[in-house]
């Protein structure tokens, strides 16, 4: 298993060239050298009394003589991530040299891991102006001819030297390898790790106490017996009034009151693992995670909190003394507050909680576990384009000035489409038509219609050549037809084909435009905007390292594509942006691109159709975050000089967690604002309204959903992805304010 687990993206290690002194010109001015004491091996004794005053070097990486080139088996520079890093191989192992903007928090979390008996990578903090730091930088400069990575390191006061854990991240497991790796012991370790994450409020792994999708990239399964090793840990302290503490209390009440029963929270974690690996660990796997979680909780509940607080303060003092690093002043009080919750749950249990039946605990249906034939490759993380149907007729009053709205959850009695994201959705004659998207890990080409009047889903029975399974495509309504363009398949192969669905005839047709004009290159998560009898395609991604900023127009009457010669302040290549028509121009905002798609944009541009010219405009207010594309819908009211326009957008993601706010962008003033959403008293009704309680999970934060707006001022969203893939319909009534 070890050989199968250790995955490195390329051959990491090359022969080390001779060192260069060129780094000296890129280093900060020399500072007085601080003598560094040799780190000693740290083994946590039963009675936790450790003197860390010498250095925060609690793991023994061993000495690395950066001047002795003979000891290196290889060194390789990588620009993966936002700052880049180096891999260094010696006889004693492989290590990572990197910058960490979170170095004090990461170091503190590793100390907590050791205290709780969890495995953590060996780590040492190296001062860049120390003798070791200077020698390290000069050595690494020899292979970094561009100086891009080494300059970043040299400008940091401290550098992180970390052991490379040989293994595989949890999200890379497949249906073949998962049964061998996800043993009872592994599941118990995952439970213990979740307890640690609850203590430090780290939602970026398995989100047992949060509503996001988590990040299985931050859980490594070591080749040494599938040992669970956390990576990229952090502490995010919260105020005492935050609902995180109450959610943890409720979770503990449920687990303690119903031992041996699968809780809804751990059932959701089980679903997330199924989603990524295609393998269902079953009820036994969930219960094993619960056992590991409670074992760590009980261990923490046995701590002498006064003594433990002194230990935490000594760690903090050591970080400050040795490396001038300071964790947040709220971190230690927050950790102690969480430990008191653990202590109270074990020693002063509350009355029993209701039965933890997964099926009754959440309004969200759990996805069907993937079969063994499910692809092991996850779909693209870039969400699909929004609905681009023509704007509906205006309601009796303008919605541009609305500050509040009511939301309601639509209860559907009959069978629903499978949960999905990155699908398309258009509104036609009062019905929502949903095509394609990713269902768990598989792109689909199924086609559903939802009748809002009857509250009923139906499969659309159609004739003709339907589009192949895809996600990230665009859908536009024109001339009694839905027009599908682009997208990508399971293997992230992008498309540039064009299909229509005739609503009256219920027929599909593949469109073959005339060859006179240039055809758009394959792409997904582009924007498709209807202006008169033309469809404008802007941007999109061809793959994670290739983004576009070109503008194509498809003229329906001529059945012809044209590449426009756009000039002016052209936006950077991007995907996932919102683009709408306003006064015969295209207004576009946001998106992301850059190497690997990690650059998020919060800029706005106007493309004047008459002159094919871009210019940038300034926006004000509270912007939506755009690490994942936004689902949006345009709205127009009035005519002539009194015409108003806005864009409504719900959800999205900051790259780590799905979001749950409703935004409005005023196209006249370029101002963004958040619209306060109020909850309906009953499902399917508006009724009287009450404020959403703090921590309320509905409407569930999400991304990758579709959004439509009807002529009465009601916005409807379907599906998307939160902590799980979703299959619900949520509505926002903009007239109930």
From Swiss-Prot:
The reply on keyword Oxidoreductase is no
Localisation per UniProt entry: Cytoplasm
The source's domain of life comes to: Eukaryota
Grouped into one coarse class, the protein's main location is cytoplasm
Q: What class of enzyme is it?
A: transferase
Q: Name one GO cellular component term.
A: cytoplasm
Q: Where is this region: Disordered?
A: 21-44, 347-397
Query: Could you state a single Gene Ontology molecular function term?
Result: ATP binding
Documented EC number(s): 2.7.11.1
> Which reaction is catalysed here?
L-seryl-[protein] + ATP = O-phospho-L-seryl-[protein] + ADP + H(+); L-threonyl-[protein] + ATP = O-phospho-L-threonyl-[protein] + ADP + H(+)
Provide the activity regulation entry from the record: Inhibited by staurosporine.
Q: Which UniProt keywords apply?
A: ATP-binding, Cytoplasm, Kelch repeat, Kinase, Nucleotide-binding, Repeat, Serine/threonine-protein kinase, Transferase
Q: Where does ATP bind?
A: 82, 98, 163, 165, 178-185, 232
The Kelch repeats are found at 431-480, 482-533, 534-584, 586-635, 646-693
Spans of biased composition, class Low complexity? Answer: 358-397
Q: Which family does it belong to?
A: Belongs to the protein kinase superfamily. AFK protein kinase family.
Quaternary structure per UniProt? Monomer.
Function in brief: Has a role in the regulation of microfilament formation. Phosphorylates the actin-fragmin complex on threonine residues, in vitro.
| Name this protein carries in UniProt | Actin-fragmin kinase
Species of provenance: Physarum polycephalum
